Amino acid sequence: MKKIVIAGAGAYHFAPAIFEDLFVSWRAPVEVWMVDSDIEMAELSARGAQALARAFGCEARFYYTTQLSKATFSADAVIFCADFLDEEGWKKDVEILEEVGLYKQARLRGGVGGAMQTMRVLDFMTDLATQMSEECPDAPLIICDSGFGGVQLARACECAQRMCGVRTLGLSGVTEQTRKRLALYLDMKEEDLDIECAGLNNFSWVTRLRDRKKDTDLIPRCMKEMQEDSREALSSQYIDWYGAIPAGERVMQYELLGDTEVSPKKTVLLSGVGLADYELRKRNLAMLTVHGPLSPEGAKAWGQIRTSGLSSVRPVEVLRALWGEKDCRVDNLNMPCDGAVEGVAPGRFVECPAVIGKDGVHGIAVELPVELHDLMGQLSLCNVLYAEAASTGSRAALREAMEIDPALAGVDLLYTEGVLSDMMEAQKEKLKRFF
């Protein structure tokens, strides 16, 4: 019986696919630990999953807790899908940056704001990975990213694998999200778009966009329309610079680049879901628990649950492939570069389509404009250095990362270092490795 720990069991975007694959499709004997900061969500997730397991004849044991540290002992795998957005810490970052006139550095992923967010998230991630290396050293860690939360996926993967020695892979839904965005923009049906995205997490680009019915390349049309559309100023800028269409549910690549006239003044936090969505999820889990998925009421609740997440992000399928049970293809896998993405040194984490099977993980080669190669090499090195700084408390690595961070281009480094030092001091209880 495999033991699987789900950290962020109530994660809106990922829980449906995890539940479906574990208890409806796979149905193998499994011990599942549901971990969530919301104890009610953790319990409802466990009970809802138990109802699925019973209905579909899956032998399973369930536990729930709010403390991840209690769940990892002897685990066969850990799936991390918590959003990890510290809103209180983020607000403090924004206040300080606005006070000193660096409001455009209030970002979640790049620059000063991104550095602070990285250090907060990776302080926790280092604790988790260190514990895994001691208590379940052979267990893979699968980190999921919705694009809305506070986890910088590439840096988290670098931290867990490179710094802590835990085998780590990351999953995102950027291709699925980009398909929805561009189908709406081009006034087409999603199923008619053949799309591929690759690059780095939060810095992915459209590498293929075709009309399935007509078998025609849609990239020239999409670029032309965006360059003529005042609402797509950011996309147009990147098309001019790099000859590529930015991927994602919304254009966020600016967070990892220097400021321009068209880049937003600061990042606006978008969760993708609201309180009402989570309350509906809880209600549906309760209905599923009481009625089971085979009754009309339970079937309706399960139907609403299973269609409300990201359908392409399936960590259980990845685990089965790693365990040699069933090969799988992943649209957007964050993995150590094996040559699939040009410009990035081997071993640094990239985001690309990949195949996972008995013989390992293999990225599928993609073609990105040469204008992006050096930049992605620079950003991937930034990810490594920020991960090293956050996991070890190295201020030397932090300074080195800031020196090459494209988001800090044109900003006085000495002044910025002083500002960041003040921000760290104000939240030193969350950055124990630096103090």
Describe these PLM feature segments:
Residues 24-56:
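Glycine-rich phosphate-binding loop and adjoining beta1-alpha1-beta2 segment
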Residues 16, 135, 140-221:
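Rossmann-fold dinucleotide-binding core
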Residues 35-40, 55-136:
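Rossmann-like NAD(P)-binding element
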Residues 6-9:
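Conserved N-terminal Rossmann-fold NAD(P)-binding element of oxidoreductases
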